Amino acid sequence: MNKLVSGNNIIPSVNFHLWEPCNMRCKFCFAKFQDVKSTILPKGHLKKEQTLEIVEQLAEYGFQKITFVGGEPTLCPWISELIKKANLLGMTTMIVTNGSNLSKDFLVQNQSYLDWITLSIDSINSSTNKVVGRSTNSIHPDRIYYNQLIQTIYEYGYRLKINTVVTKANLNEDLNDFVNDAKPERWKVFQVLPVRGQNDNDIDELLISEKEFNEYVNRHSKNKFLITETNTDMTNTYVMVDPAGRFFNNQNGNYMYSDHILEVGVQKAFEEMGYNYDKFIDRKGIYQWK
């Protein structure tokens, strides 16, 4: 049943966190899924056939846009198959990536099927990125690194978004010139989000108040690409599927998980969550993604 096109006020976009493994160790990450890995999913991901089936069921239910997230989704050996399947089923396709694994082979292979690339860029200072864990043994991103990456993304014809998480580490930085040069269609700026069971161990030193977040926002308020989200804005407004194939939602600072989509179907699993359509609209969740 295509529930979404029947006129119901149901959020039309879904984030599929298909892959727990990541090659960076961002201290503030709200999607580490160690709880999932330690209890029901030792490998941190489902089998390829299961992930393809989930994509098919999400499309059949009527989701119009799917964002592949991790961990780091480009580490998944069959990510291109998932992107292609989602595209052929009529969904707008997107990935959120740290960019470290965006090879030219990947960009060529997915040209016809992947609509958007969202880069996670919190700082253009390598020292800040090292402090928060946004680096690998060989990659310490700075402005030059990101400029080259963005240029390559545009050369292959992809639409660009940038996601920035504001923490104590980058609170006083200014990304105006960088973002204006990058010209993403959307620059989403998030207040660092504490989630019990995901980032408890490292988050305290990075937390900021809403007042501090607003100071960062005000510094960038004239930036035409800017879209901001406080912790309150984010809560109950993202339809998310975890690596085990369950919808999940942040409720009172904890993740609550639905039954498995492959066992009970999308509709029953979806209805177990308390997603808020009106808040989704308020945070500008609908835009020209086609």
From Swiss-Prot:
Q: Which Pfam families match?
A: Fer4_12 (PF13353), Radical_SAM (PF04055)
Keywords of the record = 4Fe-4S, Antiviral defense, Iron, Iron-sulfur, Lyase, Metal-binding, S-adenosyl-L-methionine
Query: In this protein, which residues make up the domain named Radical SAM core?
Result: 6-226
What the entry lists under InterPro entries is as follows:
Aldolase_TIM, Elp3/MiaA/NifB-like_rSAM, RSAD2/Viperin_antiviral, rSAM
Catalyzes what? UTP + AH2 + S-adenosyl-L-methionine = 3'-deoxy-3',4'-didehydro-UTP + 5'-deoxyadenosine + L-methionine + A + H2O + H(+)
By its UniProt entry, which Gene3D superfamilies does this protein fall under? Aldolase class I
Q: Where does the signal peptide begin and end?
A: none
Top-level taxon: Bacteria
- EC annotation from Swiss-Prot or TrEMBL: 4.2.-.-
Which GO terms are recorded in the biological process aspect for this UniProt protein?
A: defense response to virus
Listed CDD domains: Radical_SAM (cd01335)
Q: Which GO terms describe its molecular function?
A: 4 iron, 4 sulfur cluster binding; lyase activity; metal ion binding
Name any cofactors this protein relies on.
[4Fe-4S] cluster
Binding-site residues, [4Fe-4S] cluster: C22, C26, C29
Function recorded in the entry: Expression of pVip47 in E.coli (strain MG1655) confers resistance to phage P1; has no effect against T7. Catalyzes the conversion of uridine triphosphate (UTP) to 3'-deoxy-3',4'-didehydro-UTP (ddhUTP), probably via a SAM-dependent radical mechanism. The modified nucleotide represses transcription from T7 RNA polymerase-directed genes (possibly by acting as chain terminators), strongly suggesting these nucleotides block viral polymerase transcription. How this protein allows bacteria to resist viruses that do not encode their own RNA polymerase (such as lambda, P1) is unknown.
The text of the family note is: Belongs to the radical SAM superfamily. Viperin family.
By its UniProt entry, which NCBIfam families does this protein fall under?
viperin_w_prok (NF038283)
* UniProt-recorded name of the protein: S-adenosylmethionine-dependent nucleotide dehydratase
Record the organism: Flammeovirga pacifica
> Quick one: which gene encodes this?
vip47
